[in-house]
Amino acid sequence: MDAGVNHLISQLFFENKHFYIFQERCALAGIDVPIAAGIMPVINKRQVQKMASLCGVNVPKKFQKILEKYEDNPIAMRDAGIAYAVDQIVDLVTHGVDGVHLYTMNNSYIARKIYKATHSLFESTHKGAKDASNSA
């Protein structure tokens, strides 16, 4: 913070409650810069296992069931991973998140699908912020 940080990006997570706890801890520590939530849409079971191991990320039972159900169907797995990420983003925006960072691993298809499903949430939030600043 002393070096001039003006925003943060969280590591990935699959349960929003962990991000909300992180936000609270940052606030208690006096960190008052915007924090973007790090969301990684999962496209295969191996990817989840690797990231969970690497980052110490908890994989909730709800998500484990999705992984098991679609592990032999790559297209369905990709679509379920995108849907799960979109649900996370909707919840985050509803709770006033400062922003979202997508860890798409350079997969433009996933980025495009998530953008199409969520851009209106950000446009209405951004428009509301612009309207509020214009009326001040």
Model-derived segments and spans:
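Electropositive phosphate-/nucleotide-binding environments in soluble metabolic enzymes
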Residues: N16, D79-V86, M105-S108
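Active-site-adjacent beta->alpha loops and helix N-cap segments on the catalytic face
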Residues: L12-A27, N107-A117
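Conserved, mostly hydrophobic/aromatic
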Residues: G4, A37, V100
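Active-site pocket-lining/capping segments in soluble small-molecule metabolic enzymes
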Residues: E24, L28-I82, D87, T118-D131, ...
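A short pocket-lining beta-strand/turn micro-motif at the edge of beta-sheets
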Residues: I31-V33, G96-H101
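Catalytic beta/alpha-barrel core
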Residues: N6-E15, H101-T104
